[in-house]
Amino acid sequence: MLEKTVFVEEISGSMQVDAPFVVEAADLKEKRDGGRYIQLTISDKTGHGACKVWGTSDQSAEEIEAVCCAIRPGEVYRIWGYAKVYNGTCEVNVNDGISCLADPMPQEGFDPSLFVYAPVDLDEVRRRLGGMIAKIDDPGIASLVLEVIDSTPGFFEAPAAKFHHHAYIGGLAEHTLEATEIALSLSGTVNRTRMDTDVLLAGALLHDVGKAACFRHQGFSFVALPEYTLVGHTAIGAAAILRHSAGVDPSRFAHILHIVMAHHGPYGEVKPRTPEAWAVHFADNASAFLRAALDDTADLAPEEERKGARCRQTVYRF
């Protein structure tokens, strides 16, 4: 069996790569000449990396597409190619190695600790989330938050997104904690602020709860379910919250529901109408965008810049 001798964080320009990696995602892309290639996101315990599968010169676009469709995200595959820096990002390029993507490697012979990227201290996140819930004075609202989270399988394991931010095991819980702490901080920072802190906290704690139902565990990772795009996590989260409305003042419950439905801000179907809803929207964006920017700059050298794959903006490191 091929041993795990190369890790994502060790891949650098011009090196030969031949090692097992988790394939997090496989997307079919079109080349300028009308041909096809596969954009892979690969990972292991050290993080995520990019990989482009070009195939061989005699392969048709249909054959490349067939390989892409057969790849099972979350499984371990042999990645055989060479590294190259393109637009500031180090990528693995695969030609003949496309044959290695026909089937995943058997997981039984691998140590999961070498392949699972899980930077979150979940015990610490649980403790701090509990502290945020404890700040809610209204017992009905506190019970609502606890009941929804406790009845949501995968809340502490699921990622917060497929790629752009907190895209790792425990990412949803970590992002929820960050957004809640930021929202609470905003409520106490702006002068002459009058916000319903209980409603603000509940809305922040539950704003992304629907994402837990949008992913399922596969192999060494999580993959997005059709519900992720067909229904959307906001609607799924709202449905979960509505099942636990008993015991909460109707007006305050409606406000919590508004925060959840409006947390995408001016680009969402429901626009924020209250200071609490705007605070959660800004907190959500701050957590997501800062995580993306931090990840995009993590491997930059001083005075180096590139287009960040996650934040989709040019990033620079001083």
Where are these regions (language model features)?
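Divalent metal-dependent catalytic cores for phosphoryl transfer on phosphate-bearing substrates
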Residues: 168, 174-175, 185-299
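OB-fold nucleic-acid-binding modules
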Residues: 1-18
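A short alpha/beta connector and helix-capping loop motif
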Residues: 298-307
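Acidic/polar residues in short coil/turn loops that connect beta-strands
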Residues: 42-46
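OB-fold single-stranded nucleic acid-binding module
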Residues: 26-39, 49-53, 57-111
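N-terminal intrinsically disordered, cationic/polar leader segments
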Residues: 306-311, 316-318
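Divalent metal-coordination and catalytic microenvironments
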Residues: 21, 74, 179, 260, ...
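Acidic/His-rich, divalent-metal-binding segments that scaffold phosphate/diphosphate chemistry
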Residues: 105-228, 266
